[in-house]
């Protein structure tokens, strides 16, 4: 399988010596589980054009300091790319900003939280355990969070 990673943000300067970029972090993480996956990286944040949907096998969209409501020239084409990929049934995963831009592109609503930044560790209740999660899910999970934007309306047909 070939995974196309769409880079939408740059790693903050203080940690670039240890973590060069988000695509590298994801390649390292995913390759530990499946070393046979091939990767292609497209950096929209650095002006690289989005690929043609035809032939793509799977897409991962990284995090970014941008918000879906920001007026950057790469956000609208990325949203169209997401819609085109969804229409072509190409599997997509969004991390942080990636899931927010996917939600907005597919008909959901994302806002800047009126409470400001959410930073720290947060616990979430697991409401469903789909087959692809292995069928053995915990009742709750705790994960580190750092965000100020949130999806407040899911796209049609989406579930959490």
What is each model feature region?
Residues 106-160:
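Pocket-forming structural segment of enzyme catalytic cores
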Residues 10, 46-48, 99, 117, ...:
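Residue-level detector of flexible, active-site-proximal loop/helix-junction positions
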Residues 49-54, 101-103, 152-155:
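Short loop/helix-cap segments at secondary-structure boundaries that form the rim of catalytic
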Residues 65-130:
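Cysteine-nucleophile active-site neighborhood
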Residues 1-73, 77-80, 84-88:
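N-terminal beta1-alpha1 cap of cysteine-dependent amidohydrolase-like domains
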Residues 24-28, 100, 149:
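Active-site phosphate/pyrophosphate- and oxyanion-stabilizing loops and adjacent acidic/basic residues
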């Amino acid at each position: 399988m070939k995974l196309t990673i769409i880079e939408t943000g740059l790693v903050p300067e203080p940690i670039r010596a240890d973590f060069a970029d988000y695509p590298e972090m994801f390649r390292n993480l995913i390759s530990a589980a499946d070393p046979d996956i091939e990767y292609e990286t497209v950096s929209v944040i650095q002006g690289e054009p989005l690929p043609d949907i035809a032939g793509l096998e799977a897409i991962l969209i990284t995090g970014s300091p941008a918000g879906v409501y920001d007026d950057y020239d790469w956000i609208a084409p990325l949203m169209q790319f997401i819609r085109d990929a969804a229409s072509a049934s190409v599997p997509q995963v969004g991390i942080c900003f990636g899931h927010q831009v996917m939600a907005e592109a597919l008909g959901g609503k994302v806002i800047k939280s009126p409470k400001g930044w959410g930073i720290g560790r947060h616990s979430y209740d697991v409401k469903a355990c789909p087959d692809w999660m292995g069928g053995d899910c915990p009742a709750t999970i705790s994960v580190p969070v750092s965000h100020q934007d949130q999806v407040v309306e899911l796209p049609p047909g989406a579930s959490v």
